[in-house]
A protein has these predicted regions:
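Proline-centered turn/helix-capping motifs that create local helix->coil transitions or kinks
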Residues: 277-281, 291-301, 377
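ABC ATPase nucleotide-binding domains
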Residues: 251-271, 278-287, 303, 526-537
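Amphipathic heptad-repeat alpha-helical coiled-coil/stalk segments that mediate oligomerization
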Residues: 297-321
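A structural signal for long alpha-helical coiled-coils and helix-turn connectors
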Residues: 103, 241, 270-273, 277, ...
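Short amphipathic coiled-coil heptad-repeat segments
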Residues: 136-142, 267-271, 287-292
Length: 537
């Protein structure tokens, strides 16, 4: 259990949040949400002591253990994978090492024997005899194969390290578990495993995530950081979102009515204040006006970008035909014998256990890379807009955002360019920001503005939700659902896939699976599960 009392975090004159009084109890999972910069990660850091609060206290239950998902991927490079996980339970790791050091002494004394006996008792109480098998089970569940367990962390890829550090945080079933963006760099199957694990977790969990399906699957409560305060609501993210939108609409209507009433009273006073016959009535209305309290909606930290894709022309009957496409990169066969036709109104999500396969496929379809075998043909009516996974090469120049966007636009007038940048939340002087200093999320929003200007009827999106906050993801999602054209995309966002796509193509070294069905049905179908295994054998 974690108790927060009168917590305030302030940097200079800027107050992130204040007067926070919350209690996080066992058996519940709390999803922490808020706009970028609202203080989600900072709040987690105050809970585990990563930073000091300006004032207030954080209290952990007596004799309880708190575990945090580590963000430094190089901290354990000189440790084996299995030992890195075991270190997640610091007291158990200490006892293990102290016990082993005693037994290794050449002059093992009677006193050492007594000490060793005490350590053995502690070791057993902490279920130490099952520690290595429990750690191995976690690693396997997260997709780290057994032949990697004794390797050093420095030998692993970045994505494999993320999984090991997640296993470290989960190890030993801590009383309090704090996870900051745990699904980053995880494939969809691993995210599903983590959802099931946390759904059955009996202790206290606090999680920051931009994955709506993940939050909906595991959270019993939503903790919203906004208006410089932190509020807790029962229910998952979707329940909070729909409730908050309804409350905002109701408050706006109430404010509008109050404003209309105020104007009516002011007009009455102005017209009749000099009229003696009505002076009593005027005085009465003056008192009403003084009592009328119009509660303005406080300016939220949340901003929803205006993402709108408007095709300049409708797609014809021929969209895209792919025949016998294959590609091997660095000796790894990514896909082979791809054959499919894209039909009108298809919104296709491409899946693969090797995420590089989708990126290479999209690069081929954009004529950036040649396939090893096969061909592809786009229809004559097709115009394409592409959101690549790696956008770094687009932002190397020391130019303003206005000049950056002008490179991709026939209309280079200030008004036109400001309009598109404004839709992507760059307003006022922000349009003069330099392109080479943008954050990951800002870059993606610029790339979306570039796409919107093209007025394309086919959108190619490689992991489009990367670096975006929940508000941008929601806006992007809603737009793609309504888009009157074709979508070819990859994604690790379950909700994005489920709500946007109407067709699934999974590609692998042994061919492909092509199904007209929803994603939830696809991943729960036993027959398809067998086909998916054969795809990678």
């Amino acid at each position: 259990m974690i108790t927060v009392s009168n917590l305030c975090v302030q940097f200079g004159k800027r107050i992130l949040f204040q007067d926070v009084n919350l209690k996080f109890t066992p058996g519940n999972c709390y999803g922490i949400i808020g706009a970028n910069g609202a203080g989600k990660s900072t709040f987690l850091k105050t809970l585990y002591g990563g930073i000091d609060a300006t004032r207030g206290t954080v209290t952990i239950g007596p004799h309880e253990r708190l575990s945090v998902l580590k963000q430094n991927h190089f901290e354990f490079d000189d440790c084996t994978v299995l030992n890195t996980v075991l270190m997640g339970y610091a007291e158990l790791w200490r006892v293990m090492n102290e016990k082993d050091a005693l037994y290794a002494k050449p002059d093992f004394s009677e006193e050492d024997g007594i000490k060793a006996s005490e350590l053995e008792e502690k070791f057993a109480e902490m279920d130490g005899w099952n520690a290595e098998s429990d750690a191995a089970t976690l690693l396997s569940g997260l997709g780290i194969k057994e032949d990697l367990h004794q390797k050093y962390m420095r030998e692993l890829s970045g994505k494999e390290k993320v999984k090991v550090l997640l296993a470290q945080a989960l190890f030993g079933k801590p009383d309090n578990l704090l996870l900051d963006e745990p699904t980053n760099d995880l494939d969809l199957d691993t995210v599903t495993w983590l959802e099931h694990y946390l759904s059955e977790f009996e202790n206290t969990v606090l999680v920051v995530s931009h994955d709506r399906h993940f939050l909906d699957s595991i959270c019993t409560h939503t903790v919203d950081i906004d208006f410089n305060r932190i509020q807790m609501f029962a229910g998952n993210y979707s329940f909070w979102y729909e409730s908050s939108q309804l409350a905002l609409r109701q408050q706006q209507m109430q404010n509008k009515k109050a404003e209309e009433k105020k104007k009516e009273l002011e007009e009455f006073i102005r017209r009749f204040s000099a009229n003696v016959a009505k002076s009593k009535q005027t005085t009465s209305r003056k008192k009403m006006l003084e009592k009328l309290n119009i509660e303005e909606i406080k300016p939220s930290n949340r901003k929803y970008p205006g993402i709108i894709f408007t095709p300049a022309r409708e797609c014809g009957d021929r969209i895209l035909e792919v025949k016998d496409l294959s590609k091997t990169v660095d000796g790894v066969k990514l896909f082979s014998n791809l054959n499919f036709t894209v039909n009108k109104d298809d919104k296709i999500v491409f899946l693969s256990r090797n995420t590089r396969a989708m990126t290479i496929l999209f690069e081929i379809l954009k004529d950036h890379i040649a396939p090893d075998t096969g061909s592809y043909t786009w229809g004559q009516t097709i115009t394409k807009a592409y959101l690549p996974l790696d956008n770094e090469k687009f932002f190397k120049d020391d130019i303003t955002l206005m000049d950056w966007l002008a490179q991709f636009s026939e209309d280079t007038s200030d008004l036109y360019l400001r309009g598109y940048l404004g839709k992507m939340l760059f307003s006022g002087d922000e349009v003069n920001k330099k392109a080479n200093v943008l954050s990951g999320g800002e870059r993606v929003r610029c790339m979306i503005a570039r796409m919107m200007i093209r007025n394309a009827n086919v959108l190619i999106l490689d992991t489009p939700t990367n670096h975006l906050d929940l508000e941008s993801i929601q806006a992007f999602n809603n737009t793609l659902v309504k888009f009157k054209g074709n979508v070819l995309m990859s994604s690790h966002d379950h909700e994005f896939i489920q709500t946007v796509s109407n067709r699934i193509i999974e590609i692998g070294p042994n061919g492909m699976i092509d199904k007209l069905m929803e994603y939830d049905d696809y991943i729960s179908d036993d027959h398809i599960a067998e086909l998916r295994e054969r795809l990678y054998q």
